[in-house]
Amino acid sequence: MRIERVDDTTVKLFITYSDIEARGFSREDLWTNRKRGEEFFWSMMDEINEEEDFVVEGPLWIQVHAFEKGVEVTISKSKNEDMMNMSDDDATDQFDEQVQELLAQTLEGEDQLEELFEQRTKEKEAQGSKRQKSSARKNTRTIIVKFNDLEDVINYAYHSNPITTEFEDLLYMVDGTYYYAVYFDSHVDQEVINDSYSQLLEFAYPTDRTEVYLNDYAKIIMSHNVTAQVRRYFPETTE
């Protein structure tokens, strides 16, 4: 486990899933077993206190990002004077509630994704072949954008007008954000690529995320004519 002291009131840590298992917890424990999840977070707090003298005083605010290889957790002490005057028992109860809420939200999000994509996600095939595909795309040109939510993805799928069909595409997701990568054949004119990118930006946003980052940390949830798949499985949204 790697611990970073951000300032007097905030610490950040990253722990791999193998390290989690070495501590007697499983990856599933974190997101499907609330009691075990709480035990894990409290054990981390004890270790942080020992290494960084980060004593639990008053309520804590926690933020968790789950990656393919591990979990990043940011923990901050409240600077609110009223909340700092809470008793230790009240602070502990509030921290437990925050952990429970966090685990519930994470579990709910994962359940929804499973329901939405379990019929179409061939994770074994996609994860096993994505690096091979990346190597095969050396002669292609790539654009990557991000969608803030699934509704934006659906809107793009129904309202876009592709200028060319000479491309491959992948839809990734990480930290609740959707990333859409388009790989154009090498002989496609740059003007066509520019026009396609402009059309994408009517529904999505630029991003500095790279293909390497997405392959390492994101999950492929759709591939091969993403827009057609979205239209097949999701109705058009109405304002």
From Swiss-Prot:
GO terms for molecular function: protein-macromolecule adaptor activity. Pfam families: MecA (PF05389). InterPro entries: MecA_C_sf, Neg-reg_MecA. The N-terminal domain probably binds unfolded/aggregated proteins; the C-terminal domain interacts with ClpC. Belongs to the MecA family. Homodimer. It comes from the Bacteria. Residues 118-128 have a biased composition (Basic and acidic residues). The gene is mecA. Enables the recognition and targeting of unfolded and aggregated proteins to the ClpC protease or to other proteins involved in proteolysis. Residues 118-137 are annotated as: Disordered. This is Adapter protein MecA.
